[in-house]
Amino acid sequence: MISSSLDMLEESLVKKIEVMKKIEEENERQKEILKNYDEVDDKAFEETVDNKGELIDQLLLLDEGFQALFDKVKEELGDNKDSYRDQIKRMQDLIQEITGLSASIEANERRNKKLAEGYFSAARQKMNYSRQTSAAAFNYYKTMNNFKDIPPQFLDKQN
């Protein structure tokens, strides 16, 4: 019973690593999308956000299942840890790999957040510039329409 439970815990950790690697791939894809503010594909960006959301949901499910099973196995394992030393060592190695991936993902997320903030800031500036240009053109149009019936003010009168 304990051995099969430890196998399931190990399998859960392996799946978690696979999901985390997929998140890293999505982060790289997101970085490429956001790299050049003028050529951002909004649809592709949204797709990466959705994909990462699904992957994070998978991670949460794996974590919940792992924790529930771990709590049961922990009690049963008790003093028999030496009997399962190899399995425990493999799981510790997997947990170290997960910790490294987690740190890498966090760093990539911070980088992508800065890129996204830059993109949104540039987009806001473009919108403000367009709004200002449009307002200036409208004001010019209104002003010119108001002055169309006024005769010239400066006439050269020579006697």
Annotate each PLM feature.
Residues 1-61:
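Long, hydrophobic N-terminal alpha-helical segment
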Residues 65-90:
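Carboxylate-rich helix-loop segments that flank metal/cofactor sites and access channels
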Residues 54-69, 97-108:
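Amphipathic alpha-helical coiled-coil segments
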Residues 84, 88-159:
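Short terminal interaction segments
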